[in-house]
Regions:
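Active-site-proximal beta-strand elements of phosphoester/diester hydrolases
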Residues: 1-13, 38, 99, 112, ...
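Short beta->alpha transition motifs characteristic of CBS
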Residues: 45, 101, 112-119, 218, ...
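CN hydrolase (nitrilase-like) catalytic-core segments centered on the catalytic cysteine
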Residues: 60-83, 146, 155-237
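Short beta-strand scaffold segments in enzyme catalytic cores
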Residues: 84-86, 99-102, 138, 217-219, ...
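Active-site catalytic loop in hydrolytic enzyme cores
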Residues: 91-167, 180-190, 252-255
């Protein structure tokens, strides 16, 4: 059994104000005996539409910069796994990567994922400020289970989650900044539950709160049961999970095993 802490909070546009809050959340989660603490997308800083691409890039950092280094050290001092997010510098002066990372209990970065599906939909255009990642990392092995990393809009593309589950993911971690709008919360609930059910895995989905975002951070079990729904509450939610539930679910309901991939060769997936 592992205890997961999910952080739901409203970030400032100033990363120097957000970092102390993030470190405090990590310490609080560790004090409450959590094994892993997961944060939402844009935890580093909120980027309003009025902010230019160059302004966003100016605040971005390398993965080994001060922001992630401080989080890594806090994880080490408190012996807790941290899944965080950042806006990562690229070679272009006006573009960043939307990146999630995994830090182990020793403070070492053991996983990194650059968001592959940018939110160019429903009036938004993330590609005006960001670059899409081009690699789907294999699941990250941790003491709580094998983590598959996706982010927010990625939820709408089931091939990504299926590829990770087929490669051994037991927990999908989905840091998000899910924008408000007609039917958007319904989509959020349905998509997270669907990814859990069809892959027989846990889904841990920390969501950003406030600004234009929905909140509703979730933890869902392999049968699609909602174990935690944080609604509009700012702070930390806790949930206990067991990887044996994933193994038993996949044994009783062997969706990955029963797939007929031999039938798909003539289709463009």
């Amino acid at each position: 059994m592992s205890k997961i802490a999910i952080v739901q909070f409203k970030a400032s546009i100033d990363k120097t104000k957000n970092l102390p809050r993030i470190l405090q959340y990590i310490k609080q989660a560790a004090k409450n005996h959590a094994d892993l603490c997961a944060f939402p997308e844009y935890m580093m800083f909120f980027t309003p539409a009025s902010q230019s691409a160059k302004q966003v890039a100016h605040q971005a950092e390398a993965i080994n910069g001060k922001f992630v280094s401080a989080i890594s050290e806090c994880a080490r001092q408190n012996s807790i796994i941290v899944v965080g997010t950042m806006l990562e510098k690229s070679k272009k002066k006006d573009r960043v990567y939307d990146t999630s990372f995994v830090v182990n209990k020793s403070g070492k970065i053991i996983g990194k994922y650059r968001k592959t599906h940018l939110y160019d939909a429903l009036g938004f255009k993330e590609s005006a400020k960001m670059l899409a990642g081009r690699i789907i990392p294999l699941p990250t092995k941790t003491s709580v289970g094998k983590l598959g990393m996706i982010m927010c809009y990625d939820l709408r593309f089931p091939e990504l989650s299926r590829a990770l589950a087929s490669s051994g993911s037991e927990i999908l971690i989905v840091p998000s900044a899910w924008v408000n709008g007609p039917m958007k919360e319904e989509h959020w609930l349905t998509l997270n539950k669907s990814r859990a059910i069809e892959n027989g895995c846990y889904v841990i989905a920390p969501d950003h709160l406030g600004h234009i975002y929905s909140g509703r951070s979730l933890a869902i079990d392999p049968y699609g049961r909602i174990l935690l729904d944080m609604k509009k509450r700012q702070g930390i939610g806790y949930v206990n999970i067991s990887i044996s539930v994933v193994r038993n679910t996949r044994k009783k309901l062997p969706l990955l095993k029963n797939r007929r991939t031999d039938l798909y060769s003539n289709f463009r997936l």
